[in-house]
């Protein structure tokens, strides 16, 4: 999703809130927390580690060791469906991803790439950050 699309989506959400259409409590609480730590003008998640460090983290990851053989299947499924599949560590940093050409470009434009940090405190309200917060 491009920056202009993100801004439009934000306006839509803000307009809904102005009309009294409250989000699910869990989402509203996340927005409140994010206001303290996230730059509202940011259009991409921070990618602040070197590729070699990401590779080392992925190689050492317990998920990687248990997913041997699944990477190829996930890659094929992601490419065939033109979607993005990703695995993060316990801190919300993407360690591995694969995707179809179109969605991979979109993912790259918002920092949804290996090394990208998708924790609620660094990138705002998002599914990965919320899952981490809830322990799911």
Question: What are the language-model segments listed below?
Answer:
Residues 1-121, 126-130, 134-136:
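Intrinsically disordered, low-complexity terminal regulatory regions
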